[in-house]
Amino acid sequence: TGDLGASPDNINWVLTSYIVAAAIMTPVTGWLADRFGRKELFLTAVVGFTVFSMLCGIAWSLETMVFFRLMQGVFGAAIVPLSQTFLLDINPRERHGQAMAIWGAGIMLGPILGPTLGGWLTENFNWRWVFFINLPVGIVAFLGMAAYLPAVARRVRGFDFFGFAMISLGVGALQLLLDRGGEVDWFSSVEIWIELGLSLTGFWVFIIHTMTAEHPFIDPKIFLDRNFVTGLAFIFVMGVLILASMSLLPPMLSTIFGYPTVTIGVVMGPRGVGTMISMLVVGRLMSKIDARILVVIGFLLTAQSLYTMSSFTPQMDNWLIISSGVIQGLGMGMVFVPLSTVAFATLDVRFRTDATALFSLVRNLGSSIGVSVVTVLMVRNTQINHTELSAFINPFNPNLWAVSPAAASGDPMALSQVDRIVNLQAMMISYVNDFKILMVMTLLAIPFVFLLRKPKQAPAGGAPAAHMD
């Protein structure tokens, strides 16, 4: 933050600007792809994302950094949904599982390995290299896509400005609320109430407009597909589980266990290995095993890992952290690949680009909401736990006399040391309770897996099936 002359509070806008811009632009991906060409939009998105990533690396002030990050979000919003759309389009239905395994590996490994790589670059070089490293990746991606991506016919359709404005208002205000809530003490701030009101208004008007408009921004027929709607609900849950649990571990390992950044990356990295192995295996198993069974097994593995995390103590060794992370990676990979395949298996191909954009948007919203909720619970519960534990620090407690006679007799230095221990214990209890909540959420999701319908066998030539069992 010193390079930009910004305080830690102000630097949060660097993240907020990207998230809000990407959230607003994601829903419009389908219309832009139809209007300007899917391949052309994809190439433009990669170029824009890479260029503004480089500009972030050379930003000379907070204002320029925030603007460059905002533009990076504008261009980056289309990359994930378009990549999924292309892989679904260029592969026959019977190979969708393997295609989604490859795609999912990139989607899942990014959030897992990104912080580790970013921390290493920052410690050994400079924070600017977090952005510079995107240049060679962007160049290779552009050249590969320009050479091999097929051109897709454009489709002319009107643009629903009012619908876009309303969903942008709803999504943008919600993301601002989630990103700013922790800084301004949530609903004790007028700002948060305003953002909540704007978000609810935007979503409500958008829903009414979508149901009544002649040519709405998003065709409501998309939501008639049972698999897709169920898939949206589950990808929201996955968004919560993936980033919520991952957002808890680094501060816990740093604050309570005293791990340096590099060590945190080392103990969390194997989670990505578990995810990669799971996705590659599941991609092949989908042609032999009902995708719903794979999703159930994945949720059970995820719940098992969260149960293990709920037993974490400050005295445990690294292997418990690593093993629980690997199991969670295996579980999430087993959920993500079948879910990303089955959700689109019965959907009309006309809606695929809009649908992948919605899929990406809902996953990101789930991630944002999950991180915000578990963070709030951790902070608030730490305060409550600290108050309850502090009640035992008094001269009438014989256990305190046995552990620290100086603290029991009122020595200020000894009491300060005891208070530090109490605070760490209060935080540990809060982290454990968060993991328990995520575990229960995972288990509650399992019965609803069977709302997904198994699609009929793809017809010859791999054309998408339009009917369900």
Q: What are the roles of these predicted feature ranges?
A:
Residues V140, F359-K454, P459-D469:
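Hydrophobic transmembrane architecture of multi-pass small-molecule transporters
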Residues V14-S17, T44, F67-F68, V80, ...:
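Hydrophobic core positions of alpha-helical segments in small-molecule transporters
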Residues T44-G48, F52, F68, F75, ...:
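Residue-level signature of the transmembrane alpha-helical cores
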Residues T1-A147, V281-V282, M286-I289, Y307-S310:
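Transmembrane-helix bundle of Major Facilitator Superfamily
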Residues E123-L241, L248, T255, P260-V262, ...:
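Hydrophobic transmembrane-helix bundles of small-molecule transporters
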Residues P8-L15, Q175-L176, S188-L198, G202-I384:
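12-transmembrane solute porter fold
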Residues V20, I24, V51-M54, I58, ...:
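Hydrophobic/aromatic residues within the transmembrane alpha-helices of Major Facilitator Superfamily
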Residues W60, P92, Y148-A151, G182-E183, ...:
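Short helix-capping/hinge motifs at transmembrane helix termini and TM-loop junctions
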